[in-house]
Curated annotation (Swiss-Prot):
The lineage of its organism: Bacteria, Pseudomonadati, Pseudomonadota, Gammaproteobacteria, Pseudomonadales. The keyword Calcium does not apply. It comes from Marinobacter nauticus (strain ATCC 700491 / DSM 11845 / VT8). This is Large ribosomal subunit protein bL34. GO terms for molecular function: structural constituent of ribosome. The gene is rpmH. InterPro entries: Ribosomal_bL34, Ribosomal_bL34_CS. GO terms for cellular component: ribonucleoprotein complex; ribosome. Belongs to the bacterial ribosomal protein bL34 family. The keyword Ribosomal protein applies. GO terms for biological process: translation. Keywords: Ribonucleoprotein, Ribosomal protein. Gene3D superfamilies: 1.10.287.3980.
Amino acid sequence: MKRTFQPSVLKRKRVHGFRARMATANGRKVLSRRRAKGRARLSA
């Protein structure tokens, strides 16, 4: 069985990136929660 984590910068950005988060209402909720928590990094 192959390892499940096959890193790809493009996929990472498209799925978990800042612009991907901003594109949906729920994504914006994620960012606001992370801001409220005081995260140094909001998204990938």
